Curated annotation (Swiss-Prot):
Source species of the chain: Rhodopseudomonas palustris (strain ATCC BAA-98 / CGA009)
InterPro entries cross-referenced by the UniProt entry: CsbD, YjbJ_sf
Lineage of source species: Bacteria, Pseudomonadati, Pseudomonadota, Alphaproteobacteria, Hyphomicrobiales
Entry-linked Pfam families: CsbD (PF05532)
SUPFAM superfamilies named in the record: Hypothetical protein YjbJ (SSF69047)
Family: Belongs to the UPF0337 (CsbD) family.
Protein name per UniProt: UPF0337 protein RPA4418
Region listing for Disordered, in residue ranges: 1-54
Disulfide bonds: none
Length: 71
């Protein structure tokens, strides 16, 4: 999966998790609050993965560009 998709899915999971937590809070459902917290954390992780992929690609592009200039 590409970095953009990781970021989009991460944001979606974050928002869904926050919504679940809010509903759990409003209804007194500890189960729903817990599920929401887990889903939100998953979203943070997915976004971090997308950012890491971008950083690796940027570094690889810079290295390739520098190597090409030295040829």
């Amino acid at each position: 999966m590409g970095s953009t998709m990781d970021k989009i899915k991460g944001q979606a999971n974050e928002l869904a998790g926050k919504a679940k937590q809010g509903i759990g809070e409003a209804t007194g459902s500890d189960k729903l609050k817990g599920e929401g917290a887990i889903q939100e954390a998953k979203g943070h992780g997915q976004q971090a993965l997308g950012n890491a992929k971008d950083a690796v690609k940027d570094t690889a592009d810079k290295v390739a560009g520098a190597a090409h200039k030295n040829l």
